[in-house]
Amino acid sequence: MNLQEDIQRIRQMMGIIVENYYDSKKLYVDMGGVLVKKMGADEGGSGGDTDYIGSELWESIKKYNPIILSATGSKNIENSKKIKTKQVQDHLKPTPKVEFVVFGPDKKIFATTTHDDLVYPNILIDDSETNIKEWESNGGIGLVHKNNQSTLEQLESYLK
């Protein structure tokens, strides 16, 4: 039995039943280093390197209605948002919702979702171990992206 099954069993024993548990949590996905190459716009650059690298990953996760969660950096914030939004619109179908934070560790504010007075951990796929540590310290489930196969295996283990 895995942790999620244990949680479900305990909830059932306590009379806490969520019809569709996975509708109560969200999947967030980083852009740079996960779906596109590092682009530099979040460091104040022009974002010239916009190669899309995440087609296999995206095709496998889009059924979970992921939300793109990306840092803009403190320089050229509006330009970074514009470039990243265009990348999402150009490469990801169906086009997902996009959320921005200024710095990567700030992503932690999205780590949990409250539904019917219950708090559920959200999942973040990110290539930054620092971002994942911050996410997990705020109650979320973090998956450090190294390659598509390992990320998908980890994700499936949480969503079984």
Predicted regions and their residues:
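Non-catalytic pre-domain segments flanking phosphatase-related domains
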Residues: 7-12, 18-29
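Asp-based phosphoryl-transfer active-site loop
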Residues: 22-40, 135
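Short hydrophobic segments within beta-strands
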Residues: 30, 69-71, 125
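Short catalytic/ligand-binding loop motif for oxyanion handling, primarily in non-cytosolic enzymes
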Residues: 36-38, 75-79, 108-111, 131-134, ...
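Short, acidic loop-to-helix structural element flanking the phosphoryl-transfer center
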Residues: 37-68
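Substrate-recognition/cap helix-loop segment adjacent to the acidic, metal-dependent catalytic center
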Residues: 58-67, 72-102
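Conserved Lys-Pro-Asp/Glu-containing loop-to-beta segment of HAD-superfamily phosphomonoesterases
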Residues: 98-130, 135
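Acidic, Mg2+-coordinating phosphoryl-transfer loop and its flanking beta/alpha structural elements
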Residues: 120-157
